Structure formats: C-alpha cells, structure tokens
C-alpha cells in the first residue's frame, strides 16, 4: 500500500538513479552492449516503483504470483534507443526517468543517460495495460496511475 507521506516527497527521489558500468555489460571492445541500455531501463523502472512505495509483486509475476493472478499486465509495445557516446567499464552514469501518460491504458517511460552531466544516451519505452487473461486493453491500475501522476510533476 502506498503511504500518504509520499504526497509530499520530491519525485527526484524515485526518478533519478545512479549506476556503474560493469565488465559483463560490455562487448569485446569494452563498450556497453546495446541491449544493456534496455535492461538498465527496466531495472531503473523497478527501482523507481519500489522507492515510490509500490511492491514489485503487485506489478510483475513472481515465483509466488503468476501473470493470471495479477489485475493487469504491462507489456512493452514499442521501444527505441539513441546512443550518443560509448560507455566503458567503471563509468558512473545517472539515469533520469520521465513519465508520460498517453491515455487510460498506456504510458511512455523516457530515460536519459548522463555521464558527468552530459547526455550520452536515451530510450523511450511504451507500455500498454492489458487484462492478463483476455489479453485485451484495460485501464491502468490505481497504483500505476498515482505513480504516473506524481512522477510527471515538474522537479
């Protein structure tokens, strides 16, 4: 359950995250492999939900909860990435997450990757809310709607 005290928090607390590039995330040239950017996006989204106060088990299937037991599923229906500079092992980056609710059943997550204050990459990932049994579009959950609303506040 989302606590009321979150209403007064700064969205920066759950939308700006930091990470260090690890060896296993690079290719033979020592440059971050392109797929890692999307993995970092999903990890950033998960961490953002947790920091905001949403339990991941309420959003994603787990070993205890399968997809059919969830109220909604949020598949990716479109994604794109832009790479402006390479990243190497040991680089520290900041990942900034911006949200945009498109309609009652879909939203876009926009990620900016920055190193030393300079943007070095970006991604856009569109999710659509569906009923996990019928696979038809449905309204976003109350939790996701609240997270999107509070995350879209200017910070």
UniProtKB/Swiss-Prot annotation:
Keywords: Hydrolase. One of its GO terms (biological process) is phylloquinone biosynthetic process. GO terms for molecular function: 1,4-dihydroxy-2-naphthoyl-CoA thioesterase activity; fatty acyl-CoA hydrolase activity. It is an enzyme of class 3 (hydrolase). Pfam families: 4HBT_2 (PF13279). It catalyses: 1,4-dihydroxy-2-naphthoyl-CoA + H2O = 1,4-dihydroxy-2-naphthoate + CoA + H(+). Pathway: Cofactor biosynthesis; phylloquinone biosynthesis; Quinol/quinone metabolism; 1,4-dihydroxy-2-naphthoate biosynthesis; 1,4-dihydroxy-2-naphthoate from chorismate: step 7/7. InterPro entries: 4-hydroxybenzoyl-CoA_TE, DHNA_CoA_hydrolase, HotDog_dom_sf. It comes from the Bacteria. The active site is at 27. Its EC number is 3.1.2.28. Belongs to the 4-hydroxybenzoyl-CoA thioesterase family. DHNA-CoA hydrolase subfamily. Catalyzes the hydrolysis of 1,4-dihydroxy-2-naphthoyl-CoA (DHNA-CoA) to 1,4-dihydroxy-2-naphthoate (DHNA), a reaction involved in phylloquinone (vitamin K1) biosynthesis. HAMAP family: DHNA_CoA_hydrolase (MF_02101). This is 1,4-dihydroxy-2-naphthoyl-CoA hydrolase. The lineage of its organism: Bacteria, Bacillati, Cyanobacteriota, Cyanophyceae, Synechococcales.
């Amino acid at each position: 359950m989302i606590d009321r005290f979150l209403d007064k928090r700064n969205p920066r607390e759950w939308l700006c995250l930091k990470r260090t590039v690890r060896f296993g995330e690079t290719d033979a040239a020592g440059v971050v492999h392109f797929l890692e950017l999307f993995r970092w996006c999903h990890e950033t989204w998960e961490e953002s939900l947790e920091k905001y106060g949403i339990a991941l088990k309420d959003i994603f299937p787990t070993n205890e909860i399968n997809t059919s037991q969830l109220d909604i599923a949020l598949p990716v229906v479109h994604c794109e990435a832009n790479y402006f500079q390479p990243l190497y092992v040991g680089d520290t980056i900041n990942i900034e997450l911006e949200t945009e609710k498109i309609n009652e059943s879909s939203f876009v997550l926009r990620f900016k990757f920055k190193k030393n204050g300079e943007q070095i990459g970006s991604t856009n990932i569109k999710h659509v809310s569906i009923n996990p049994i019928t696979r038809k579009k449905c309204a976003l959950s109350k939790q996701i709607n609240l997270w999107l609303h509070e995350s879209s506040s200017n910070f």
